[in-house]
């Protein structure tokens, strides 16, 4: 079902509608039928789509068409998407004029992933080197990722979960390109941060921010929970644990998936809440109760990986529950692809198939 839907529905939708044949790169703002409603290019999604088509070429079938689509995005990122220091802009116009400065380090993370996979697909050492260079630049920036674009003061310093989380996945993507000791060092750092700092020992759930010493902060950001993020990180942990044959980490990650799901599942309408406040206060995010496609897809990946390693019946039951909700509410059999944004009751809130944050990758 999933393979068929991916290869015969989702990927063809993006092949048909997203390619900018004039400027290169991809249009991601697509309405329900696939028509382009905005031509700006967001570098998170350019990198992710280039990675996706490179990975399809490497792991599913070496179709020349997939490699060409990947190259279109790769060339756009390399020639238009980076500043003189190699930092990746956040967004550009259709023809490649920078719109938003390179304040968001995740643009760089997805570009590095894309360069690495494309380098393998095209057997191009130059892109492997560019992936490595971009990765090392990310490490250099990790303690102050926004640099001069940081708008916060130092009055309430908080550490963010997002970077160690993405590094735990990025380093495995770049494993063949990086020095082995660099890979192990980054994995050690990421696992320590995710499982010992941001995973709260008392509640068993993941917080988005902590104080620099790892303690919890009683503020909007300090109480913030993003269930989809926490669950996604657990499948990164499972991948690392399998690589290291670490049963303890597999079991802890599996247990954490269940804890987060128990906390964040909407018992009234079904689905997983987008944001929550750890103390049950009103969340700062007005969209807190929406149901998002990526949250449910990442949860299905995490549950599938956890079940593969544990055969735990509780995981199987959760998988069925999330699977049934997702296919019932997000899939669009009429026009293809999936809806991204539902209200709390599970009704389509925006009928777009792509936008600033939703793309071909998820």
Predicted regions and their residues:
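Glycan-recognition and catalytic cores of secretory/periplasmic carbohydrate-active enzymes
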Residues: 1-362
